[in-house]
Structure formats: structure tokens, C-alpha cells
From Swiss-Prot:
Function recorded in the entry: Methyltransferase required for the conversion of demethylmenaquinol (DMKH2) to menaquinol (MKH2).
Superkingdom as given in the UniProt entry: Bacteria
Enzyme Commission number(s) from the entry: 2.1.1.163
Pathway(s) where this gene product acts: Quinol/quinone metabolism; menaquinone biosynthesis; menaquinol from 1,4-dihydroxy-2-naphthoate: step 2/2
Lineage of the species this protein comes from: Bacteria, Bacillati, Actinomycetota, Actinomycetes, Mycobacteriales
Protein name as annotated: Demethylmenaquinone methyltransferase
Family membership: Belongs to the class I-like SAM-binding methyltransferase superfamily. MenG/UbiE family.
SUPFAM superfamilies, sorted: S-adenosyl-L-methionine-dependent methyltransferases (SSF53335)
Recorded catalytic activity of this chain's protein: a 2-demethylmenaquinol + S-adenosyl-L-methionine = a menaquinol + S-adenosyl-L-homocysteine + H(+)
Residues noted as binding S-adenosyl-L-methionine in the record, renumbered to the chain: 62, 80, 100-101, 117
Species whose genome carries this gene: Mycobacterium sp. (strain JLS)
Swiss-Prot/TrEMBL keywords: Menaquinone biosynthesis, Methyltransferase, S-adenosyl-L-methionine, Transferase
Membrane-traversing stretches: none
Coiled-coil region list: none
GO molecular function, one term: demethylmenaquinone methyltransferase activity
Length: 230
């Protein structure tokens, strides 16, 4: 299987990420034109974490984002269903756990905050994954979802679509260890709901106070929410 399909068979998606793990971080930086670093900083700021907080970084990949979150003084654990991705980040000194977002291997109310960046699209059942995130978060705890979204300017949206479907696959062939995986990336972004649509899914999973903020013209959106009190 060279790339996953949009039916998101978990084993196919995990295998696809295993195949891109070796050059994943470099490829992300190149294909995002360096914006990935900015998106990670904004995600950390939106979480508002600090010493004493317990944080789950879901779909953490090689744990680059987890290390940056841990710089806040919070205790952070990286979780991903791709063992290859976690292995590629083995030199990063944070706890790592392999697990499925729809069946997280953590007890109820284990975390003060949960975040998932560019991974919710790959979960076979988005609402079930969001419900699991709520289960492992304490009442009053925070969720931040950083995900590709819909550009707000029509002309920019047209250019972005051209980049996704034409330029990105060509660039991936030059730098990625599995270029076909980035065709799946482009297709999954096109099929993803817009900002309001994702907000509705988050609310449907039981989160409250859902709001979002656009980054890079809406290419990415940060959705934040709170787990309601009991």
C-alpha cells in the first residue's frame, strides 16, 4: 500500500505514516514553506499550559510538537498510532505511547489538556476520537485542534487548491520518502469540513465553548474547546 485512501482504514493509514517517518519533519517544513513551526507555536500558546499540567499530544508523530509543549514546564506525553513515527523520534526525551485515537490507552480524566495537530483528518471516526479525547480530559480541561481548513479569501483559496493538487505532489517527489502519501494528504484536506463544520463535530462530541481562529489565511485553523463540568 503506497498511500491510504479516504476510507481511512487504520492499518493502511498507519502503514503510510510508517513509510514517511524517516523524512517526515523535513518534508513538512519544506511543503509548508516553513509555516509548520509557526503553527506549532500558536498551538502551544492556545493551550495555555504550564508547570503542573498533564498534556496529551495526540497524533504526535516524531514528538517534535511534544518537546515544544514540554518546554512550558508541563508534563507531556506523545501518542500516535504509527509506531514508525514514534520510533523516528526516539531521541526526543518525552514519554511515547502507541495508541488508536478512538481507543486511547489512558484512564478517564487523566489530562488537563489534549491537543491534536494535523491528525484528526486521519481518524476513521472523527466524533468518536473527539469523544475519547473528552473522556481522558478532566472537567474544565482544554482541547486544541490544529488542522488544515478552508482559506477565507476566494482568490487565495483558488491558488491554494492549485498548490495542493499540483505543486505539492511534485514537491513531495523531490523531498519525501513516500511521495504518494502526500497525494492522500491533498485529497484528505479537500474532503475536510470548513471551520464551522469542524466546530459542529467538536460540539457533537460533548465539548463546550468551541471557538476557532484562522492561521495563514485559513489554510490552518485552531479550534479550542473546554470539557464541561460534571
Amino acid at each position: 500500500m503506497s498511500r491510504a485512501t479516504l476510507d481511512k482504514n487504520p492499518h493502511e493509514v498507519a502503514s503510510m505514516f510508517d513509510a514517511v517517518a524517516r523524512r517526515y519533519d523535513l518534508t513538512n517544513t519544506v511543503l509548508s514553506l516553513g509555516q509548520d513551526r509557526f503553527w506549532r507555536r500558536e498551538t502551544c500558546a492556545a493551550l495555555g499550559i504550564g508547570p503542573g499540567d498533564k498534556v496529551l499530544d495526540l497524533a504526535a508523530g516524531t514528538a517534535v510538537s511534544t518537546v515544544e509543549l514540554a518546554a512550558s514546564g508541563a508534563w507531556c506525553v506523545a501518542a500516535d498510532f504509527s509506531v514508525g513515527m514514534l520510533s523516528a523520534g526516539r531521541q526526543r526525551d518525552v514519554p511515547k505511547v502507541a495508541g488508536d485515537a478512538t481507543r486511547l490507552p489512558f484512564a478517564d480524566e487523566s489530562f488537563d489538556a489534549v491537543t491534536i495537530s494535523f491528525g484528526l483528518r486521519n481518524v476513521v471516526d472523527h466524533v468518536a476520537g473527539l469523544e475519547e479525547m473528552a473522556r481522558v480530559t478532566r472537567p474544565g480541561g482544554r482541547l486544541v485542534v490544529c488542522e488544515f481548513s478552508t482559506p477565507t479569501n476566494r482568490a487565495f483559496a483558488t491558488l491554494y487548491k492549485e498548490y495542493l493538487m499540483k505543486a505539492l505532489p511534485r514537491m513531495a517527489r523531490a523531498v519525501a520518502s513516500n511521495p504518494d502519501a502526500y497525494v492522500y494528504l491533498a485529497e484528505s484536506i479537500r474532503a475536510w469540513p470548513d471551520q464551522a463544520g469542524l466546530a459542529r463535530r467538536i460540539e457533537a462530541a460533548g465539548w463546550s465553548q468551541v471557538r476557532w481562529r484562522n492561521l495563514t489565511g485559513g489554510i490552518v485553523a485552531l479550534h479550542a474547546a473546554v470539557k464541561p463540568p460534571r
